[in-house]
Amino acid sequence: MYGFRLLALFCIANLASPAYARVDTVYTGHQQLAKNVDQEYNYRVIETALKLTEPEFGDYKIIVQGDGDIPKQRALEQLLKINGAFNVVLVPTQPEWEEKAIPIPIPVRMGLLNYRFLLTHKDKLATFGTIHTLETLLPLRVGLRKSWATWEVMQQQGFNVVNAYSYDTLFSMLDMNRFDYIPRGIYEIYDELKSRRLDYPNLVIEPNLVLVLPTPYYAFVSPHAPRIAERLTAGLTMMMEQGILRNMLYQHYGEALEQANIGARRVIHIKNTTLSEETPLDKKHYWIDLFNASLTP
């Protein structure tokens, strides 16, 4: 379905396109770029996909819009506008994004966000020692933001979800016992805790559990930029098939993966019923299996 929709948009756009060479310009938000290791990875993915497709598509440039983090809903609004601030955004997939923008169903982090550790208060550790199944985890209060992809998923699965109105208040609310834990990606949680150690010395990473919740991280393109979508699809496919994306993943997140020692933890699987039929779950080489993978490319 995505491929047909993208082809139609691309053909329509090119009916009015001049024959001379063009420069493909990607407009993306500051939160997509080199503010930290996580955002630097997003930038390198975009840049590499564009670079690999130069022989077919020609020159390109990347323009950064804004000077700070952009809320996801505002980013989507800009993505959908003609001449909006962005024409490419990388985020965990959600139904609204797939319906309104052009999704490129290639998981740019190879499912690394599927694996989540729990940030909690040290006084709660004994409680988590008794958790071995999804059924025993459900009654505990989980802190999330409504804009996160995990919100709808965990709501549907019967979790006791508590809303935090901003990213920063999550940590203060956890410290004040407003909820019991925050599930965070294994490549996120260590830096998040380290940067807040002085403010919240009682917050810790629960040492024995890992949640596995399928959360593909896609590039989304404006419906007004079908050529960019066509180009990124080609570039990301090359990156995946040639092992470039996997190598990049280990370069950026290898240290966090080694620190995680995920194989020693009890595993709780959570279904993601919001995923579309286009999710490439059958393409095993698109996904990293941390329980059976080497920590080198």
Task: Name these PLM-found stretches.
Residues 16-18:
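N-terminal signal peptide c-region/cleavage motif recognized by signal peptidases
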